């Protein structure tokens, strides 16, 4: 085991503070509407220019191991806030730095760090309750657009596109962000349930111009195995041909004789049919087939539950108003499933989302949920250059997260005003004298976001803090226009979830750093002297003959 270096007490806390300050000072220049950019060197390609706090934080790695520990702990604050709320990373970093800087001074002066932390925790609890109290629910298109605009660094176009996407696919809908081929940023929406499987043969196409199969009032056969043998499929084909309805077959695969027969019948006009592979793989495929069955009011024809393909009857088939299938995707619009069954399925998927610990599984479950209840919207981000596109795409993703957070928990006045308004709740706290120091730490720290926003805008932070403190309700400083306004009316708002998460995560990590008494790191390996070069380059004499 490698030898370790250990640092204690004040020396350890000073190292943490240096690391915290280095990282926070690089991140906090990006805060607010007049925040500056940070340029990050990349090992290949052009440097990355960003105004996103968490991107800056993730790039920082310090040479000194002990200082690096401090930096990494604050990085954790930014990452955690980004994971929970999708935004507020810079605010969280600024708060963590302010809390730790104040707390470290008190500990150095001989105060008990554990008591300070207790006071800190109680203050945060009271502040979170007060933020929820100040919070106002968000409903209309205009407010959603305002949240998106603020999070996208005052880009109104992005705010409007996000609000439109939310309106079209609903709160549970999936909104994805992709890079566009053109310069414009556009929105595409898909109604109903879409999955990424296209037709198995181009002969199923009904609209040659658009190369898609479109069918109305469709019966849907959902099967979880391969279909290769025609005699298994024949009974259900005869029944649907008699009913005169088009048929969509969704199965693990359709091949050989079965596929050939379907194509021949389609070309002869005997049967309007289309076949696609089932979406997903393994257990996820089974779950998605069940989703389709519930949405369309049909059953999954599976031998596991005692249904055989040859015994399938018309009442086991799903039904939908319209289906379109192109070479890559199948879209089912207006399935005939019972509303109660769909809601039951939605409830079950929501429970699974809450229980899962895997981010990948959660994302896939949310996609399934969206397909059942809302739809899917795709924001295609366009820009003149690749560097600008990457920066813009990151802003759109930030704004999207913030908007979802706002719809979840409501909004509070932005620009750091909500923190100043919540301060009044701390006057009511009755704590022991040592714990009161923890409350004082947080009181000063909550002024830091508005102070930093003002400084980035080239204004004296202390004057702004003083003026806003003396105001009421949503009165605050609009750094973009250098005026004092009603923040809610001016559309300068923050999602409550973002403000709350930033404060909780910052206080949690800063409290842990404050109560740190020892630090342990690996001892750097000493570089030995370089080995001597071997003597003489023997054996090279014979190279004269190469002329």
Curated annotation (Swiss-Prot):
GO terms for molecular function: ATP binding; ATP-dependent protein folding chaperone; isomerase activity; unfolded protein binding. Keywords: ATP-binding, Chaperone, Cytoplasm, Isomerase, Nucleotide-binding. Its main location: cytoplasm. Its EC number is 5.6.1.7. It catalyses: ATP + H2O + a folded polypeptide = ADP + phosphate + an unfolded polypeptide. It is found in: Cytoplasm. CDD domains: GroEL. InterPro entries: Chaperonin_Cpn60_CS, Cpn60/GroEL, Cpn60/GroEL/TCP-1, GroEL-like_apical_dom_sf, GROEL-like_equatorial_sf, TCP-1-like_intermed_sf. Pfam families: Cpn60_TCP1. One of its GO terms (biological process) is protein refolding. One of its GO terms (cellular component) is cytoplasm. The keyword ATP-binding applies. Together with its co-chaperonin GroES, plays an essential role in assisting protein folding. The GroEL-GroES system forms a nano-cage that allows encapsulation of the non-native substrate proteins and provides a physical environment optimized to promote and accelerate protein folding. Belongs to the chaperonin (HSP60) family. This is Chaperonin GroEL.
